[in-house]
Curated annotation (Swiss-Prot):
Coiled-coil features, chain-numbered ranges: none
Family recorded in the similarity comment: Belongs to the NrdI family.
GO biological process: protein modification process
GO molecular function: FMN binding
InterPro entries listed in its UniProt record: Flavoprotein-like_sf (IPR029039), RNR_Ib_NrdI_bac (IPR020852), RNR_NrdI (IPR004465)
Natural source organism: Mycolicibacterium vanbaalenii (strain DSM 7251 / JCM 13017 / BCRC 16820 / KCTC 9966 / NRRL B-24157 / PYR-1)
Positions of disulphide bridges: none
HAMAP family: NrdI (MF_00128)
Protein task: Probably involved in ribonucleotide reductase function.
Protein name according to UniProt: Protein NrdI
Length: 152
């Protein structure tokens, strides 16, 4: 299991990063809606950085509207397992801040952040991190399935 769901704006930076990963991925469209049917890790860009006083989660604007609409679907939100955010280090503390917001609001781990299209090191780190993440998730799921426990 290595499902990714991602959003990329017309800049295509996040799309390029996801392509480099070489993993199964579903793109949230710029126009229109989708629904997913399997657990996934969300990859998204961060918008609107560069505020003089640092991150302000009450201000909004960090998470793309398309991602908000996707996560406002209760079914989609129920399947998110983690988040990875893209950003720009020029924005200081707001670098990858969309990941912080989604992590807090959805109660999932913020797994990684990368700059713009990511580096080769980012690609390797995310690939390995996702392999480990899904292996741990499968192990946890195996240990907690009631049907298997009833047979013991």
């Amino acid at each position: 299991m290595s499902n990714l769901v991602y959003f990329s704006s017309v800049s295509e930076n996040t799309h390029r990063f996801v392509e480099k990963l070489g993993l199964p991925a579903t793109r949230i469209p710029i126009h229109g809606r989708i629904q997913v049917d399997e657990p996934y890790v969300l990859v998204l860009p961060t918008y609107g950085g560069g505020h003089a006083n640092g991150p302000d989660p009450d201000r909004g604007g960090y998470v793309p509207k398309q991602v908000i609409a996707f996560l406002n679907d209760e079914h989609n939100r129920s399947l998110i397992r983690g988040v990875i955010a893209a950003g720009n280090t020029n924005f200081g503390a707001e670098f990858g801040y969309a990941g912080v917001i989604v992590s807090r609001k959805c109660g999932v781990p913020f797994l990684y952040r990368f700059e713009l299209m990511g580096t080769t090191d980012d690609v390797f780190a995310v690939r390995q991190g996702l392999t480990d993440f899904w292996a741990d998730a499968r192990k946890d799921q195996t240990c907690h399935q009631p049907s298997q426990l009833q047979n013991l």
